[in-house]
Structure formats: C-alpha cells, structure tokens
Amino acid sequence: MRFIDLFAGLGGFHLALSRLGHQCVFASEINSKLQKLYRLNFPDVPIEGDITQIKAEDIPPHEILCAGFPCQPFSFSGKKQGFEDELGRGNLFDEICRILRYHHPKYIFLENVSALPGHDNGRTWKVIKQKLDALGYDIRSHIYSPHEFGIPQHRPRFYIVGMLRNEQGVSGMHRFHFLRPPKDVVSDVRSIVDPEDNDRLVAVRRDLHPVFDAWQEFVYNVTKRDGFMPSHCIFTMEFGADYEFEDVPPAFQSVERLRGRRGAYGRLLEGDTREELIAGLPFYMQRTKYSDTFPEFKKILIRQNRELYQRHKDWIDLWLPKILPYPRTQRMFEWSTTNQDWDFKHHVIQLRPSGIRIRSINCVPTITLCTTATPILPFAPFPSKGALDKKGRPYKPEDFRWGRYISHNEAARIQSMQELNYGKLSRVQKVKALGNAVNVDVVELIAKRLLPKRTPK
C-alpha cells in the first residue's frame, strides 16, 4: 500500500513500512538538513518542507498516513504547553486532520511522547480522540519502550493507530490488538557497542576522571559498611549541615536563628545580613518561593542525606574535599539501578543537571535532545586501531580510562537506523536527530499487526 511520511525526520516510519513492502509516495520535513538526508536516502520519494504550506490536494493519494508529530509541546523535557505551544507546534496535529479530511486514508499510524495521554489532565488526548473520531476513525493506543523487546534503550513512546470506518460504520479495528511484549526479555547495551568503532568518538574528558574516581570510592565505602546504596539522590551539600528547615524554610528565618548554624558542606553561616547568611545555604534552600510551607519530599531528602552523613562521618569528612573543586552538578549523585555490582565500569553513566547518575547496563536512557545527557559507556575499550577526537587529533589509551560517550553509530543502531547515510551531519546533529526519531523495529512490530501482509520487493 501507499503511505505518506509526515514530520519525517530521518525516515523511521519509511524504513519500517518499506520493510513490510509498502511504498512511500510523499514526505514532509521542515528541517532543511534532514530534508537533504531524506532525499539522499530515499531519492525516489518527493519530500516537501513546512506542512502548513502544503495543499492537501497536492499530496498524492495514499492508504496509510504516518506521522511522528512534534512532541516537545507535550514532553517532560519541553514546556508541556500542548495545543497552546507558543511556537505553534501543538496545532500541527490539526494539519494531520486537514490531510485526513481530504484524503481519507484507510490507516493512520501516529507516534508521540508517553506524557501525551496525561497532558493537561487528559484533556489534550481527549480532544485528539474526538477529532479523529469525527473524521471517521476508530483508534487504539499504547505505550511501548524499546527495552521491552530486547532493544537496549529505555524510551517510552505513545503509539496511536486507527482505521477508517466504512459506510456501515465498521472499521475492523476491533480485530486489532497491540503486541504483548515477551516475558523475561533481556537487553544489554554491550550488544550495540562496536569495540573498533573509531568514527568521531568523544572520550570522557580528563577533568571528569577524578570526579568519577571520587564517586567510585564513595560507593565502595558506603556499600562496604551498609551493604547497599541508598536509592535517594546524594546531596553532598547536606554533609555536615545543621541549619533548621522542618517548620520554616531557612530563607524566611530570622538572622538570629540562622547565625551560628552550619550550612552547605558543614560550613559555619556567617555574616551581618540575612543575604550573607542565606548565601551560605545549599542552593536549593536559597530560593524564596516557599513561605510557611516546605515540600515534604524535600524534607525527607534532607533527612536522608544527613542520616547518611552521620553513619559515615568518619570517612566522608576526609573524602568530601576531593569533590568540592568541581561544578555543583558533579557534587550530586544517584545510584539508579537495583544491580548490586558496585563497579561503575559495569554500568552506564549519565551527567545530568541533577547530578551524576549510574544506570543499569540493560539499557541506555532516552537519547535526548540535550547532548549533555548523552550516555557514557565506561566499559567501552580503546579501539585497537586508535581513534581521533572531533577535531581530528589522536586519542591516547589513557583518555579512555573512563570510557567514552555513546557513539553516533551506536545511537543509530539503537534506533535501528544504522543503514542510513548521514551525509555531513555533525555528531551533535546526528545524535539530536536520532533522539527525536521513532524506533524502526518497534514501529515495524506494530505495523505488522495493523496492516495487511505484503511481500517486500
């Protein structure tokens, strides 16, 4: 059958449906660089730009409409403005409806972020369903993450599929059921790592090596005594602190109550003014948006960190200076896995605004549009043939002591897009594009159940 690929990006829907023998007859993508790549990879398919400028009658007839419509208005990482998005991206769903109204394709296949069903307390999703129903479509929806099918990435996405009702008001959608992921499936990041990949690699910066060394020491010391790692975030600013917080937030306390207490890192709060005293508190206590109330979850987090410090004060006081010279985000830490192998080299590391996070080797987190959160693979070896940095300079083996960031080739493998030609995209541009793409294998699994079987050419 013929299909169109709207908000096409790298062409994930195109790859998946082509595998099943269907033919793409039209694509739309507003990003000019991605347009060029689409033409490079699919030269026989006409691709246009801004969908709002394309007349529905200029789009070829088709039986399937595919669209990974813009997710930022509904995502956790975006502002979650939905249909009120200031850039107009939320209203792009209406462009899909405009094309459906004109062409009436039998099938629709849409993809968005997992936050969409709950956006605006469910009202956004309710409007989408109402609009599709008014156009004659029965729909089903489901949230899948690639790791449920053995693909080593945790990336929940919301899939919407639908069929057009016939003159008798029947669509056949009642026969469709989403695939149930296999039980006990195991994924492993190492399955997508190529030890000899040396194309535009980015090693962990050397100034991060002592930071990782220090946190590795911290984990070893805590687990040696306690036998486990706390699941809460480690805020080193609370180590040695004793300022009061249970009744009134410190930013609203009197000078007399603050003076003489210990603030961030156990340092004495000193100064003649409230501003000087508050400046010595942890950064999250310097805010004044809370007055007579303070969130209970923050109180719990502070108590947990102070209790951790008291259990380990004998060695933390000697350890803390090792981490103090580094940026604030590197002085916070989270052990985000149930795995009790305490060696960082057997996990995935992520640098986040909320701190350093250790994750399971079973899957990488979402390849985000924020390249600073790109997963680090500390187990990735130094290629036997050497490697060059992004400026073309040779790396040394010691540069890889803490591994490297996931490569753009590995990111493509995770999204099942390794067969594409990425032209002259920079590493950052490629990772961003892959982070916004649909997972080809997951789309193919759903399409197999939705669409009639076709024999690939």
Feature roles, as predicted:
Residues 14, 72-76, 116-119, 150-154, ...:
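Short catalytic/ligand-binding loop motif for oxyanion handling, primarily in non-cytosolic enzymes
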Residues 66, 141-143, 159-161, 366:
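Conserved hydrophobic/aromatic beta-strand scaffold that supports enzyme active sites
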Residues 48-49, 114, 136-148:
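Conserved S-adenosyl-L-methionine
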Residues 128-143, 164-168:
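A SAM-dependent methyltransferase catalytic signature shared across enzymes that methylate proteins
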Residues 103-106, 137, 156:
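A short helix->loop->beta-strand "cap" motif at the edges of active sites that frequently abuts
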Residues 2-110, 114-126, 130:
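Core alpha/beta nucleotide-donor-binding catalytic domains of modification enzymes
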